[in-house]
Amino acid sequence: MEVRMTPLARSRPRWRNQLSLQGGGPAQATLVIAMMLAGCAVGPNFKRPNAPTIAYPTPPSAIGPQSVVYGGDVAGDWYRLFQSQSLNALVQEALRANPDLEGARHNLLAAQYELQAVAGSALPQLEVGAKASRAKINGSFLYQPPDALQRTGNQFSLGPSLAYDLDVFGRIRRSIESQAAQTDQVGHQALNVYVTLINEVVLTAFDFAASAEEIAATRALVADLQAQYDLTQTLENAGKTTRSDTLQAKAQLENTRAGLPNLQKQHDIYRNTLLRLTGKAPDDNSLPPLALHDFALPVQLPLSLPSQLVRQRPDVLEAEDTLHLASAQVGVAQAARFPSFNISAQYAQQSGGTGDLFTKAAQVWSIGLNVAQPVFEGGRLRAREQEARQRYLQAEAQYRGTVIDAFIEVADAMQALQHDTDSYNAHNTALDAARANRDLARVQFERGLVSELVVLTAQQQYQNGVLTQVQSDAQRFADAANLFHALGGGWWNVQADAGGEPAILEPVKRNAALSLPGAPYDQP
């Protein structure tokens, strides 16, 4: 199994040889001018990693009553497949009121505004300034003897100034690309909050319902054990059983009773977790009723194609954004080693008095081109470039690891579904046998064939089976939910009117706020 990546170019910047000053001439000058007009950007152009050549373990065509649709898509409202109105209401309330989701939305909006701010650096910067000063000058300033002319006077100036970085080698554009990748990263983090929130609400709802039924089953079991203990004690007093049997019944009763407080504690934790997920305080009593028998298993289970999975999971997309950001930073570091070209222009009305400030004679202007080339910086710029390359390689390795983790999570979910279904079927068979044994014991007791103790023992075995079956049933629901989450959560299929938040669900458009031709991306 191998995850392949598009490698980062490790050759010298391609423009370095072309800009060599050795043997200069008209051809070289033409090349420099052409580069300035074209606005070339040094550094690697990012390309999305190819879909990995990873396969799932051979999926079954069906898991119990559920069919597996290989290549099937995940519904945006997959939680509705469990057919519970109470669950649907909880998810919608969480999407509306969860503070973490609201915080993620504002964080995304802030990142988008930051991208717009950074993008502004690619455009000419125009300012209007005004200045008023009073100074004393001497003749030496005017190339005259110091005492030839001494004057104290006012100076007034008003006018615009323009500065523009031509960005010949793409330092600014790579910086904007880096910021755009970072904005995408924030957007996919927000998507991760969204899909994780839905999954947590669904799983906690299952746990909340299951814990209530576990409490009920345990209380019924305690009642049966209490009756069994009372009967054993009566038999001991009549000399029909031993003291050891009575103590054993007592220990079993109290051990089972001791589990009730812990079950109630877990039930309260699940309740408080649901309140937190839906943005409510612990004293709120508005949770809808939830019971396991109100849920239904989804009839079909989708299994996305491997090539689709890496385009669906927010964590993989976030890792891709990190890789893109690192790629752009390599370009920023490379561009810092090349010359910078800046145009500056100024126009002003300057005068020693306000009366003639706006006359034609008071007009002044200047325009110029500034060129700066780093010559000696102690190896700092080269080290920064090597650092950026290592950051890229680190991001590349992290991306591969994230992709592998994604496939493992899907495989784990599928295997859990299969194993827990097998376990459920076995528990169900055992429960049917325990129910039949209990019913038979009751009939035999009514006919005087067995003692009451036999009936109570059969009833106890049945209640133990009910308790185990509740846990097994809840686990199957959780396995299905975990599969939907592992496949990406279906956020790409959510409609705006389905209760989702458009600011979270809409993918961040790369350079959406920009109008830069020749964007330095190579993306499908």
Provide a role label for each language-model segment.
Residues 133-137, 277, 348-352:
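Structural signature of outer-membrane beta-barrel domains
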Residues 91, 157-161, 205, 306, ...:
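Membrane-embedded beta-strand positions in outer-membrane beta-barrel channels/transporters
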Residues 1-22:
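N-terminal secretory signal peptides that target proteins for export/translocation
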Residues 2-3, 7, 25-96, 143, ...:
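Terminal intrinsically disordered/low-complexity segments used for targeting and assembly
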Residues 137-141, 243, 352-356:
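Outer-membrane beta-barrel proteins
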Residues 102-103, 119-120, 166-194, 244, ...:
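Sec/SRP-type N-terminal targeting helices
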Residues 172, 188-305, 416, 420, ...:
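Periplasmic alpha-helical coiled-coil/stalk elements that build and connect Gram-negative outer-membrane
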Residues 41-200, 340-345, 364, 375-385:
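Short flexible linkers and secondary-structure junctions
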